[in-house]
């Protein structure tokens, strides 16, 4: 009886360890997310009790019609907008329930953002744009620039570090934006149409870079895109329709 009890206890401990490991694999989780706005006196529901999970190193594409709420979803996932109901967890912490200061600290530590338009500071060099998130963390200028230079090398722009955004091509500016998003080594990057403002060849190059960095840095990506070919190259595709995310079947690349 004692042997059986010991075996049972050992089995339960192993099961609990597996559950704990499984929880740690999820860098981002959303449960029951609802978001509504009041427009013209009418209540407009954009997200309706939707769910999402993102594993470490996973590349998730979010597709859907224009105006379906994809950008709103990213804002809620990133803690930039409050959901009307539901909860977002980031690295196992209840992101949406944290005080503003704690939420900002966790966002700066664990999330990166890339947008359709690069939003680089025009008066700063590529190097100082990439170093900015590290300076916000109160890292010394020397250390921040050293890490920023290393990340610019990773995206193939080491020789362009001293150039300002106006001296770079569209694809180069977007690569600087990706370097800025990744320089803090975030667990997850939220990307809103990151190639939407680029021509086809440049978009493909930038997307390849994102996929490569996701693999080498074990960084998760949630990528909103209208391009079905790019979406098909992600690990999973979810379609936002009527405020709810639906898993799409895997497509051949």
UniProtKB/Swiss-Prot annotation:
**Looking at the record's lineage, which domain of life comes first?**
Bacteria
A GO molecular-function descriptor: ATP binding
Q: How does it sit in the membrane?
A: Peripheral membrane protein
EC number(s) for this protein?
7.6.2.-
Query: According to its UniProt record, where is this protein located?
Result: Cell inner membrane
Q: Which GO terms describe its cellular component?
A: plasma membrane
Is Cell inner membrane a UniProt keyword of this protein?
yes
- Extract the ranges annotated as region (Disordered): 1-20
* A biological process from GO: protein localization to outer membrane
Binding locations of ATP: 64-71
Enumerate the PROSITE patterns for this protein: ABC_TRANSPORTER_1, ABC_TRANSPORTER_2, LOLD
**What is its EC class?**
translocase
Which stretches are annotated as coiled coil? none
| Residue ranges annotated for the ABC transporter domain, each copy included | 28-253
**Keywords, alphabetical:** ATP-binding, Cell inner membrane, Cell membrane, Membrane, Nucleotide-binding, Translocase, Transport
One Pfam family matching this protein: ABC_tran
Question: Predominant location of this chain?
Answer: membrane
| Function text | Part of the ABC transporter complex LolCDE involved in the translocation of mature outer membrane-directed lipoproteins, from the inner membrane to the periplasmic chaperone, LolA. Responsible for the formation of the LolA-lipoprotein complex in an ATP-dependent manner.
What is annotated about its quaternary structure and interactions? Answer: The complex is composed of two ATP-binding proteins (LolD) and two transmembrane proteins (LolC and LolE).
Q: Which family does it belong to?
A: Belongs to the ABC transporter superfamily. Lipoprotein translocase (TC 3.A.1.125) family.
Protein name (record): Lipoprotein-releasing system ATP-binding protein LolD
> What organism is the protein native to?
Burkholderia orbicola (strain AU 1054)
Q: What is the lineage of its organism?
A: Bacteria, Pseudomonadati, Pseudomonadota, Betaproteobacteria, Burkholderiales
Question: Coding gene?
Answer: lolD
